[in-house]
Amino acid sequence: MARAVGIDLGTTNSVVSVLEGGEPTVITNAEGARTTPSVVAFAKNGEVLVGEVAKRQAVTNVDRTIRSVKRHMGTDWKVNLDGKDFNPQQISAFVLQKLKRDAESYLGEKVTDAVITVPAYFNDAERQATKEAGEIAGLNVLRIVNEPTAAALAYGLDKDEQVILVFDLGGGTFDVSLLEIGDGVVEVKATNGDNNLGGDDWDQRVVDYLVKQFQSGHGVDLAKDKMALQRLREAAEKAKIELSSSTETTINLPYITASAEGPLHLDEKLTRAQFQQLTSDLLERCKTPFHNVIKDAGIQLSEIDHVVLVGGSTRMPAVAELVKELTGGKDANKGVNPDEVVAIGAALQAGVLKGEVKDVLLLDVTPLSLGIETKGGIMTKLIERNTTIPTKRSEIFTTAEDNQPSVQIQVYQGEREIAAYNKKLGMFELTGLPPAPRGVPQIEVAFDIDANGIMHVTAKDLGTGKEQKMTVTGGSSLPKDEVDRMRQEAEKYAEEDHARREAAESRNQGEQLVYQTEKFLKDNEDKVPGEVKTEVESAVAELKEKLKGEDTAEIRTATEKVAAVSQKLGQAMYADAQAAQAAGGEAPGADAGAEGKGADDDVVDAEIVDDERKDGAA
């Protein structure tokens, strides 16, 4: 059975995990790290770079480097590169492809099935877009799971009955969830958050501060210099991390820009107190979702058994202090790595779905109410927020006018009483209603939410049996053929990357062989017969010529030729050595005689192993 992985597709970093003998293991990527930056870059030569390599070259390639694309999921955001449009699903698919590749390399087998996590506050469109990103990357997405739900699964699998508060502050999204665990059931009682608040915003405050300080000191606005801004962003992130463990840090960026007087350098001290002052309003924004969750769940603070911190941003001392203050002095549980816990939970959920993990039932909830617009622009809710999913609810509606031939069903997601103030997810029309006075027709509207949080809406005229259906995807859903096209495109990029890698390897082998052969000829000039030397030099010259071009096949052929003819160097030298030995007569001693056997008898085309050598001499 094919292995299934759990993927935490984060705003700033992503993690992939797999079950090994029933235990979740975080997979180390090709660069040797356990987290992969969610950064995609398009090099000038057309190569797609993902992860650490993309992040490293961002300074010199700002316009062609894309980060934090998760914030655009489910929107019509696009980026145009080399005359080609890329949407958030395609960019995310590049990150997922890398995680898939790293997992395959680690496991030594194909990986197709995956569970991918999303913030609890993601709406329908954002969830659908995440699922599509997985499909474009060539993954069969078994389930889209809320991040705090995954964290609870990783944390609470073998625990007793308890209430857990998950405080998840990542790079770009923030949510708070309250979960009940017991009898193998993980149930999300309430969830709330802000999907435009995260560590990136803390970094941005430091960047703004540095720009302001530099402008007042040098009169130069660094905000207008893209490359300088990129360096500032990296330095701000580093400073934020350092201030989590020390009370002061220095940001030193030489040659940040130049003025008429010459190059300018940035050198600023930043204390933890200053940093906390700069970001105090961001911390304040974390409070409302917390209070909302406690109110929605209808519990007292004293009922919370454990507090779990998720996301690298929770390492900031001010955040940890805030959580302690909000929860009435409760210390957060330190037994979980905040960067990896979500991916671990996703791997466990993949195990549940594959039947590898037993005795766990995962109950998720819908984060926002769902309903339709009725007369007067009112939002009539069919499914209240925090309803456990999968779920199905239906209600009977009627017409507002006499002889109304059709009804328009407009689906909304949100908590406002007026439909227009909520997020519109889609609309469709049920036509062909028979003429009747208003209030007579009976139209049943049913909302059906599947385990991924994707909703299907049906409207049925109970009089005629006419029915109209739609899958609500917030307008972001891509047609199947579009997803297929993008998947093929992603595969094509992967093939191109593979071809580039092969070409680079062939070139490296060729260059290495040229160097080794030329060195050998130089070191053994007097021992190599003239005709052999000429033949080898000719093959080397031909290979050097091919290395100037770009034809990989020709480079490979020329390399093989050099490898073949250079064997004659060794043969010629051994023949000379044997001739010299024969001319000198047999050396005395039994050992010498044993070693002096015919060359062909004693040549083994393999590594020398002591045991074999003894056997051979016996």
Swiss-Prot record:
Purpose of the protein: Acts as a chaperone.
GO molecular function terms listed in the Swiss-Prot or TrEMBL record: ATP binding; ATP hydrolysis activity; ATP-dependent protein folding chaperone; heat shock protein binding; protein folding chaperone; unfolded protein binding
Gene this protein is translated from: dnaK
Modified residues (Phosphothreonine): T173
GO BP field: chaperone cofactor-dependent protein refolding; protein refolding
Keyword annotations: ATP-binding, Chaperone, Nucleotide-binding, Phosphoprotein, Stress response
Protein name as it appears in the record: Chaperone protein DnaK
Domain of life: Bacteria
Biased composition (Basic and acidic residues): 487-505
PANTHER family in the record: HEAT SHOCK PROTEIN 70KDA (PTHR19375)
Family membership: Belongs to the heat shock protein 70 family.
Region (Disordered), start-end ranges: 487-512, 580-618
Pfam families attached to this UniProt entry: HSP70
Residue ranges, compositional bias (Acidic residues): 601-610
InterPro entries: ATPase_NBD (IPR043129), Chaperone_DnaK (IPR012725), Heat_shock_70_CS (IPR018181), HSP70_C_sf (IPR029048), HSP70_peptide-bd_sf (IPR029047), Hsp_70_fam (IPR013126)
Comp. bias intervals (Low complexity): 580-593
